[in-house]
């Protein structure tokens, strides 16, 4: 794995094209450029290894979530929000054959053991355009035809066509006030529109449910839906009023993702592995790849642990001290003390940085997608610090032939 520089003379045009042609509407976060000046190159062997590990992790995760859905007593250990726990009985009609299951596993190169996986983005993983259009733009800019890439968008289109056969209405459900959410949905919606689908963009509360079927309630679009493509996190969705959201949990309309995704989205997922293994469900790959994860109150005098929120996203509230800004670290520690059940402790691994030709070193998070159990491409980000957060830069992933 290595970094290859986007030629300095071409970077300005590359950035403009990323914004206007590749849906990269958030190229800046505060004072940080969030579009890397590099491409990440995987060897053929590295790509094959990550795909193999990703599929094994995904198989374990999907078997586990089905079991948890039938065993509420065990699922309670995940510290699911009360409103979601109340909905679990409604999810007993879940049929994986009628839905599309999308996940993304976060791989990190480790100095000592090759790869570690820190979590699975089980509910609403993003980065669709960055993992579909940006690699093609980078390859063209670098001018190296010996590099290839996997387009997430094309894999997703294939999965949806299998379910809907290029017919029907799809609602792209997202937080409509956020442009960075809209860019994810706009790319996927535009691509699906080319396949012949009727695409509607709306918020989670723009759907009503009748006898398990989803209907759009927007003016000029009041119709039955054939697919809900959701990018609103479940823990946000359940705060919405009026309370129409409970229809998502027993919905018979094809969904990507169905709320069953909440089980693995909880970072407390490792705390149910013993129960799963007692039911003869192997978590061998997860145990091998995830750093040691324990309850906050078990840390005591143990060294080398960091705290992570149970439902954190984009690296927020993780206590990697050198990556924290201002009094952020102290605030997180105080919050951990006040709300220990909202956090967990994870053994910090030794991230292997990659060196750029600017003399700086960069830490990598390689997000590996699955759709319906099959590998579906990469979404990667890099940072000068070993915490991949909102300040990190998106980087296209290319693969040596």
Language model regions located:
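Preference for protein termini
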Residues: 1-401
């Amino acid at each position: 794995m290595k970094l290859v520089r986007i030629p300095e003379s071409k970077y300005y045009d590359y950035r403009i094209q990323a914004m206007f042609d590749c849906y990269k509407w958030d190229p800046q976060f505060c004072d940080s450029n969030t579009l890397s000046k590099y491409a990440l190159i995987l060897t053929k062997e590295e790509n094959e290894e990550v795909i193999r590990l990703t599929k094994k992790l995904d198989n374990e995760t999907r078997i586990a979530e089905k079991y948890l859905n039938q065993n509420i007593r065990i699922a309670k250990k995940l510290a699911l929000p009360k409103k979601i726990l109340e909905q679990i009985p409604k999810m007993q009609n879940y049929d994986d054959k009628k839905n599309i299951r999308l996940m993304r596993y976060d791989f990190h190169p480790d100095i000592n053991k090759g790869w570690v996986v820190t979590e699975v983005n089980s509910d609403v993983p993003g980065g669709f355009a960055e993992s579909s259009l940006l690699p093609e733009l980078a390859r063209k800019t670098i001018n190296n035809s010996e590099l290839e890439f996997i387009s997430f968008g094309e894999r997703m289109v294939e999965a949806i066509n299998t379910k809907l056969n290029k017919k029907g209405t799809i609602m792209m459900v997202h937080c409509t006030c956020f442009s960075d959410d809209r860019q994810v949905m706009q790319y996927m919606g535009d691509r699906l529109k080319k396949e012949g689908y009727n695409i509607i963009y709306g918020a989670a509360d723009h759907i009503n449910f009748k006898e398990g079927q989803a209907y759009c309630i927007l003016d000029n679009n009041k119709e039955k839906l054939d697919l809900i493509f959701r990018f609103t996190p479940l823990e946000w969705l359940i705060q919405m009023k009026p309370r129409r959201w409970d229809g998502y949990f027993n919905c018979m309309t094809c969904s990507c993702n169905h709320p069953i995704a909440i089980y693995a989205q909880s970072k407390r997922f490792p705390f149910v592995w013993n129960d799963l293994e007692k039911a003869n469900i192997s978590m061998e790959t997860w145990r091998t790849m995830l750093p040691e994860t324990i309850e906050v109150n078990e840390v005591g005098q143990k060294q080398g642990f960091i705290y992570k929120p149970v439902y954190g996203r984009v690296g927020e509230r993780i206590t990697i001290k050198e990556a924290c800004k201002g009094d952020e670290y102290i605030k997180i520690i105080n919050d951990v003390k006040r709300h220990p059940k909202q956090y967990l402790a994870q053994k910090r691994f030794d991230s292997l940085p990659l060196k750029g030709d600017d003399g700086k070193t960069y830490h990598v998070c390689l997000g590996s997608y699955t759709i319906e159990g099959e590998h579906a491409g990469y979404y990667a980000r890099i940072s000068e610090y070993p915490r991949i957060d909102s300040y990190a830069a998106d980087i296209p992933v290319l693969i040596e032939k």
